[in-house]
Amino acid sequence: MAGSSIGECFRVSTFGESHGPAIGCIVDGCPPGMTLSAADIQTELDRRRPGRSRHTTQRQEADQVEILSGVFEGLTTGTPIGLLIRNTDQRSQDYSKIKDLFRPGHADYTYLQKYGLRDYRGGGRSSARETAMRVAAGAIARKFLRERLGVNIQAWMAQMGPIHAEDFDAAEISHNDFFCPDAGAAIRMADFLDGLRKEGDSIGARVDARVSGMPVGLGEPVFDRLEADIAKAMMSINAVKAIAVGDGFAVVEQRGSYHGDAMAATGFQSNHAGGVLGGISSGQDLTLSVAIKPTSSIRIPRQSIDVHGRPAEVITTGRHDPCVGIRAVPIVEAMLALVIMDHWMRHRAQNADVQAPLPPIPA
């Protein structure tokens, strides 16, 4: 299977399936000399971990990460970092009744058509279980970006179905089960999901993100524009169906006199572009939104076919998230960290000695 790696200079390759013995990744290109421990990575994994609240899948995985290589006496060595998480709470029998059925909205049909076979246990490689390793790798990139460059990455639940976060309190994001900056909205989300779970249905979500402390100059035009690589990274996350950078789709109704971010010696006057101009970071905050579809695994009967093309009714049992947007928040942060880290290293490799005639203006 091709397509299991991301990045050029800071490259991450993941492996493993939902119900296999383990999942893992190789992080290649991490600079040497950075302090790193399993605890540094575990902090991020615990935010994504299944079973952390009643509103997510009740699969109980500890997600304890093991560092296999690339770290010696607490410091990164510059060699490939091997990470492993052992799967401990698989229930493959939950899928035995649907092993010959195509679940609507899932990758069952396309995997079978592409590979001629498929791992029906929890979706195999197509499962969001794989994203745990992205979060693990992203924790390494995020630590470097924060400590070396002062880059801060923050994502949050901005909308769940009809419920919007109307207030923004950054401190509140870590104080509720939804990573929501609006305490009142988080309460409404909890009530909404309780009812939805009883119905056996699911709901979509929108995750917003902001990266502050961005260096100027990251991005490789024309095909590796910063927002292009971010879009690819976001669209690689299970269930993501759309991404908007800056003002996103609102630009359709904007005029150029409004949208163009005016500049002065004192700094930018607005940030409709979302921190990227011509595919290169401007030094302003990088802002984006990601739309996430409803979970396809629901207990409501749906029409489908089996592997022989015969009509069938599908009811998905097992343990599933009624809203995958909740656990997508740390995944979005991780993917942002991986892309920004990779582009910083690429920029440094070519342009480390560049002296622009004008110092960066304030963001």
Swiss-Prot record:
Q: Does the keyword Amino-acid biosynthesis apply?
A: yes
The record's listing under PROSITE patterns reads: CHORISMATE_SYNTHASE_1 (PS00787), CHORISMATE_SYNTHASE_2 (PS00788), CHORISMATE_SYNTHASE_3 (PS00789)
Q: Which UniProt keywords apply?
A: Amino-acid biosynthesis, Aromatic amino acid biosynthesis, FAD, Flavoprotein, FMN, Lyase, NADP
Q: Which cofactor does it need?
A: FMNH2
| Catalytic reaction annotation | 5-O-(1-carboxyvinyl)-3-phosphoshikimate = chorismate + phosphate
Going by the entry's taxonomy, the superkingdom of the source organism is recorded as Bacteria
Q: At which positions is FMN bound?
A: R125, S126, S127, N238, A239, G278, K293, P294, T295, S296, S297, R319
What is the uppermost EC class here? lyase
Q: Which family does it belong to?
A: Belongs to the chorismate synthase family.
**Tell me, how does this one assemble?**
Homotetramer.
What name is this protein filed under? Chorismate synthase
- Taxonomy of the source species: Bacteria, Pseudomonadati, Pseudomonadota, Acidithiobacillia, Acidithiobacillales
